[in-house]
Regions:
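Short, charged beta->alpha transition segments
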Residues: 65, 93-98
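Hydrophobic/aromatic beta-strand patches that form the interior of the parallel beta-sheet core
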Residues: 47-49, 77, 108
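A fold-wide structural signal in alpha/beta-hydrolase
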Residues: 75, 104-108, 113
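Conserved AMP-binding/adenylate-forming
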Residues: 80, 86-87, 91
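Short beta-strand element of the alpha/beta-hydrolase
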Residues: 72-83
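A glycine/proline-hinged amphipathic helix-loop "lid/cap" segment
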Residues: 1-66
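Catalytic nucleophile-loop/oxyanion-hole region of alpha/beta-hydrolase
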Residues: 88-89, 95-96, 109-142
Length: 142
């Protein structure tokens, strides 16, 4: 019996997945930092929060909002992707900044822990902790 029962029709899609090695990850990390423009944008308020995940570890969460907001607004939790192995890239931060400024919502941007250093389900639990934190702080996020 195989480890996972995967339908054979999906096997060709495996050819589109690039190999990710520890060397590739190590080379990419220096380029995956929050851009300085995040704190220099005159139209944006950015606050940093340390939130507690399921195992007691603290993760960083940025909250971005337009300085033009004056009424209650929705909140978007932005999970950057990266297959849960790559940190957020500059364009992820750019997307979140645009949501905050152009859509007029608060953006919660968690820096969840990544594989392979933190195995499943750590990254999912960190994302859920960010959701719970946003829910618990809904009044101040409005």
């Amino acid at each position: 019996m195989k480890k996972y029962a995967i339908n054979r029709e999906f096997f060709p899609w495996n050819l589109f997945a690039p190999p990710i090695s520890k060397k590739f990850l190590a080379m990419s990390v220096p380029h995956m930092k929050p851009p300085k423009s995040l704190w220099r944008d005159k139209e944006l308020d950015v606050t940093t929060h340390k939130i507690t995940s399921y195992d007691g570890e603290k993760i960083t969460c940025f909250v971005m909002s337009s300085k033009k907001l004056s009424t209650k607004t929705p909140c978007l939790i932005y999970l950057h992707g990266g297959g849960f192995v790559l940190e957020a890239a500059g364009y992820h931060y750019g997307n979140a900044m645009r949501y905050a400024k152009e859509v007029g919502c608060k953006v919660v941007f968690p820096l969840y822990r990544l594989a392979p250093q933190h195995p499943f389900p750590t990254f999912f639990e960190d994302c859920y902790a960010a959701f719970c934190w946003a829910y618990d702080h809904a009044e101040e996020l409005h």
